[in-house]
């Protein structure tokens, strides 16, 4: 029996294949569950039109929100909005619900200079002892972590980079697979440019524009975000960094915290250069791929 049976089942499968590469295993599990609920609802009301009006979305939100917290309801709405945004960008007419505003108490972990030094030291000497399908892990993890830290990228965006997305003439990365489905340019410094170039030469992929920068089983498939997370947990543990945050509502050290650390350090650097945080926000938001 097919898991998705609505009129948008084919589009949903394509969308989920992208989201699986972008999200952690746990985040993807929750996201997929929401999509299944929405697909089931479309089947339940016998919706056969290749468009989704406001009435359908609002009715689903009303039904799915019964007996759950405001935060959970907000998460459902956010998830289905991402699916609908994908459908809109695919040429379908769909209503986009507004995400509920809830009180955000999340406290991110910020890596210290000492943390970063330990992480890179362990990553640079990583040895995968057990048999692994991905023979490139020991080479790709050191660079992948440096990109997360130095450029503030999302994990899903990073693993989707192809060699052809690197512009060594302008020292830019062209991000094509992004959370908001909007292509954007990310600059990198001269030191990272040299590391990237030498890495591509060493991997034998410099002249293959379709090769993934971080291969999976071969250069024309990429390592999954889940596997990156698994290998990072090994590195983090060897580096002696506690994954359990002692602060209330804290997340603890994780891959996404490289992005938070990048943002905070960018604000600090700008303030030292006389640029107020309020003036930095629009530029940093655009750089990070946020709507605002």
Please provide the spans of the model-predicted regions:
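Conserved catalytic core of the tyrosine transesterase superfamily
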Residues: 1-292
């Amino acid at each position: 029996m097919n898991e998705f049976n609505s009129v948008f089942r084919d589009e949903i499968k394509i969308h989920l294949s992208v989201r699986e590469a972008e999200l952690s295993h746990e985040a993807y599990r929750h996201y997929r569950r929401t999509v299944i609920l929405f697909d089931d609802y479309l089947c339940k009301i016998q919706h056969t039109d290749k468009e989704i009006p406001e009435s359908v979305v609002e009715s689903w939100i009303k039904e799915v929100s019964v007996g759950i917290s405001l935060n959970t309801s907000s998460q459902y709405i956010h998830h289905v909005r991402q699916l609908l945004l994908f459908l809109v960008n695919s040429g379908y007419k769909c209503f986009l619900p507004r995400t509920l505003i809830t009180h955000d108490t999340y406290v991110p972990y910020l890596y210290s200079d000492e943390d970063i030094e330990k992480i890179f030291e362990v990553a640079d000497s990583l040895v995968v002892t057990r048999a692994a399908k991905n023979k490139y892990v020991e080479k790709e993890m050191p660079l992948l972590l440096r990109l997360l830290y130095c450029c503030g990228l999302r994990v899903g965006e990073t693993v989707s980079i192809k060699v052809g997305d690197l512009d060594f003439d302008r020292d830019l990365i062209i991000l094509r697979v992004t959370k908001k489905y909007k292509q954007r340019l990310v600059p990198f410094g001269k030191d990272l440019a040299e590391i990237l170039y030498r890495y591509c030469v060493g991997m034998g992929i410099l002249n293959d524009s379709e090769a993934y920068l971080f291969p999976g089983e071969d250069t024309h498939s990429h390592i999954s975000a889940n596997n990156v997370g698994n290998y990072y947990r090994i590195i983090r543990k060897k580096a002696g960094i506690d994954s359990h945050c002692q602060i209330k509502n804290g997340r603890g050290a994780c891959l996404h915290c490289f992005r938070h650390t990048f943002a905070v350090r960018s604000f600090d650097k700008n303030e030292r250069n006389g640029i107020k945080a309020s003036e930095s926000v629009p530029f940093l938001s655009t750089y990070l791929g946020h709507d605002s």
